[in-house]
Amino acid sequence: MAEIAWGSFADWVSGIGSLAAAGVALYVANSAQRVKLKGYCGHRLIIGLAQPQEEVFSVQVTNVSQRPTVVTNIGFTFGLWRWKRHGILTFVQDDIGHGIPKPLSDGETGNWNARLGSDNCWITNLVAQFSITRFSVLTWRIHVHTSNGGTTTLRPEKNIRDMLLVHIASRK
């Protein structure tokens, strides 16, 4: 009978262990360099003591990674593939939100607000300029672009999507 050469087996196990350790080290190094943003967007009410309440479309993101970044652009899309329509939201720093560009370090939050105006004229203009349909509302996405080359995609909350659907229904 042939005997098993256990010395060769130990060499193979140590080689596989070394390869696994190198893979884990590369994964950890790569994840530390990645910028991660968490956020949401939707309809908000701003209520102040000395001023009337104001309705806004709000985009808020928080940097949850250790690497600092700068938010360079906020845009949106409607539709899919070749029927996709793109738009850019412009924000200037004012009393209700930050401007763009906005640097975000670890744990810092950025907040951008677009006033909806009287009778929600911002939503009315959005529906008219982009010829938004019910299908477009389902595919509406907000894209937050950073200086590190990353893009975070947010789905608008139900409250603002419902407002769009009401304006679409009233337009017909």
Predicted regions and their residues:
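Membrane-aqueous junction of the first/signal-anchor transmembrane helix
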Residues: M1-K172
